[in-house]
């Protein structure tokens, strides 16, 4: 999905120069600037006026000024054609985040003395490197080009159009020509959707007992391209009519994601996690159970590791590097050590994931493996790239080949059997060429439909919307020689995956298997583990009430705050009501009716009116 974020500045005076979103407030610390050091002092001595200004700076502002003044990307040593982007981009991004955290008076002072201009110039050069390293030749690029355009516009407004052209020459020669490709991508999507819908309609119209009719529809399906087949929503009906006994053998992993924030207030105990993974094993018996286990979550400008380190770890020094420590505090949450001991004994493999922020990934790896590397269950380390050098939603930086290779080799130096996984919803944030045995993970969400016939949470133009299965196919096709993991099951997708055959976890995974050529894995996100259509045995009465209220919210008909289904049924969406909307309403009614009287009485009364409205709308 093309998820979007806002570019926000804390100060009106620097609004147009705010190229990266604001970070969380905190004391400024000086990072390791090895890659930023200049070989010669080419900075002129400060004037008396500048000295006076500097004396007015707080210690934090002075530190930020020193950091910006030393950015190597603004020196003659910088070679734009050959520079490795991560060596220059990361210091600039950190400097911006620290600048945005300064009080408004300090920001104004650094604007007045020219420091902010130096920062924006550095950001402009980084943007040029980003354009240089992005193919800008496929539909996936649409998920990042709008960010590039906003950043170029901000540079242009802050520094002037002529300076922007000088610092970002690839904007005109490489970026702008991409716009000429967009109509072709949109037409291709329309053609693929049309072809898929024609076959889908034939599937629904055929008599499954008529062998000739089934064979004819099967021929229609086989004549589609691989991508067009991903637009066929009801292929399972044809599969059943053909009596095809698919083994879905390319699904070789199954499991769940675990986070301190995903399950709500009450966590699962080790044997309860195993009940969930046992159910997945029943659905996918050929798979290795794996857990995507978040051990380091975003905190402030860095990463909080959820354990108490050994006494020889200098936690104060690490805090200055944006690495913090605290034990999880959710009800029923045991220490990670206790979970891993249980997983050791039950053949459950674990990938330890971090949301690094501005923390150094290699350092995080060392700390985590020093703590847990003796557990046989540990299979590797994962990085959620959405939070790599980013602390606001979707502001993380793309991982270059050099960076991916560095992390991969670092992990394998610890244990050659360990694997790295990299997670993002857009392939352009993942290494363009370096592969090794990296697991690539897609956690895209917010789709309006499985096949791109309706707008999703983040969408504006239906012609740009691929849909769940086509988008995941685009992702997996980008890494044909590597295993991929699909982190799926987000609540923002329930309004369409609830309409699939029960069990929905199996139906969703099977269709993903069919559009995937290589080995893959199904990772169910913890947000909807406690859900009536996924793993209902994990639900308490409070969980049943919570999930029912959430589902009722999908039927809200309000034009501004409503749910996707509710708005379509109310006629206030740009999309018409769809046949699957009727199925979803029926599913919600079944769930409400399954509640006890006490649970029904605890539901939000206003949300219950949404169901009344929806049932009336589909009955018309």
Residue positions per predicted region:
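Sec-dependent signal peptide cleavage junction
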Residues: 19-35
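Beta-rich interaction/scaffold domains
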Residues: 50-245, 539-620
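Aromatic-lined substrate-binding rim segments of carbohydrate-active enzymes
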Residues: 299-353, 400-403, 407-418
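Substrate-binding cleft/loops of secretory-pathway carbohydrate-active enzymes
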Residues: 359, 364-370, 426-454
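Substrate-binding cleft of secreted/luminal carbohydrate-active enzymes
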Residues: 452-540
């Amino acid at each position: 999905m093309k998820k979007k974020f806002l570019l926000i500045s804390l100060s009106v005076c620097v609004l147009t120069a705010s190229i990266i979103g604001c970070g969380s407030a905190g004391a400024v610390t000086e990072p390791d600037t090895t890659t930023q050091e200049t070989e010669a002092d080419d900075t002129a001595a400060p004037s008396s006026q500048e000295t006076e200004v500097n004396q007015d700076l707080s210690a934090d502002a002075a530190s930020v000024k020193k950091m910006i003044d030393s950015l190597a990307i603004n020196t003659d040593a910088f070679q734009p054609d050959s520079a490795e982007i991560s060596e220059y981009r990361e210091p600039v991004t950190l400097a911006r985040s620290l600048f945005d955290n300064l009080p408004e008076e300090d920001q104004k002072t650094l604007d007045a003395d020219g420091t902010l201009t130096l920062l924006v110039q550095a950001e402009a050069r980084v943007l040029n490197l980003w354009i240089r390293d992005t193919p800008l030749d496929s539909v996936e690029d649409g998920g990042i080009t709008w960010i590039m355009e906003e950043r170029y516009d901000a540079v242009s407004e802050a520094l002037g159009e002529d300076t922007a052209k000088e610092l970002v020459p690839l904007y005109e020669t490489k970026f702008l020509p991409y716009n000429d490709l967009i109509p072709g991508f949109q037409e291709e999507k329309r053609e693929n959707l049309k072809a898929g819908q024609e076959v889908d309609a034939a599937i629904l119209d055929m008599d499954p007992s008529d062998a000739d009719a089934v064979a004819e529809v099967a021929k229609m399906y086989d004549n589609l391209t691989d991508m067009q087949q991903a637009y066929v929503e009801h292929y399972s009906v044809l599969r059943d009519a053909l009596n095809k006994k698919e083994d879905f053998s390319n699904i070789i992993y199954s499991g769940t994601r675990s986070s301190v924030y995903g399950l709500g207030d009450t966590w699962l105990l080790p044997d309860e996690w195993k009940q969930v993974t046992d159910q997945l094993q029943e659905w996918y018996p050929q798979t290795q159970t794996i857990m995507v286990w978040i051990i380091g979550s975003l905190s402030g400008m860095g990463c909080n590791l959820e354990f108490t380190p050994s006494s020889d770890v200098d936690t104060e020094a690490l805090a200055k590097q944006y690495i913090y420590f605290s034990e999880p505090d959710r009800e029923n949450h045991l220490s990670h050590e206790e979970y891993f001991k249980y997983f050791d004994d039950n053949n459950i493999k674990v990938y330890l994931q971090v949301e690094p922020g501005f923390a150094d990934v290699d350092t995080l790896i060392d700390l985590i493996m020093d703590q847990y590397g003796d557990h046989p269950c540990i299979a590797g380390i994962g990085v959620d790239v959405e939070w790599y050098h980013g602390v606001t939603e979707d502001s993380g930086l793309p991982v270059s080949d050099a960076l991916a290779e560095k992390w991969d080799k670092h992990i394998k130096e610890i244990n050659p059997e360990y694997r790295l996984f990299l997670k993002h919803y857009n392939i352009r944030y993942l290494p363009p060429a370096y592969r090794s045995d990296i697991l690539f993970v897609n956690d895209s969400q917010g789709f309006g439909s499985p096949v791109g016939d309706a707008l999703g949470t983040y969408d504006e133009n239906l012609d740009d919307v691929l849909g769940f299965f086509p988008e995941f196919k685009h992702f997996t096709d980008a890494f044909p020689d590597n295993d991929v993991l699909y982190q799926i099951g987000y609540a923002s997708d329930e309004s369409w995956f609830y309409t699939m055959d029960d069990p929905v976890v199996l139906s969703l995974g099977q269709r993903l298997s069919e559009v995937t050529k290589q080995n893959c894995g199904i990772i169910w996100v913890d947000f909807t583990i406690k859900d009536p259509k996924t793993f209902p045995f994990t639900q308490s009465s409070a969980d049943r009430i919570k999930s029912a209220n959430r589902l009722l919210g999908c039927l809200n008909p309000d034009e501004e705050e409503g749910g996707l289904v509710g708005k379509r049924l109310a006629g206030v969406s740009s999309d018409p009501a769809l046949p699957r909307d009727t199925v979803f309403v029926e599913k919600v009614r079944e769930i409400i009716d399954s509640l006890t009287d006490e649970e029904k009485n605890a539901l939000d009364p206003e949300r219950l009116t949404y169901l009344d409205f929806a049932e009336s709308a589909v009955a018309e």
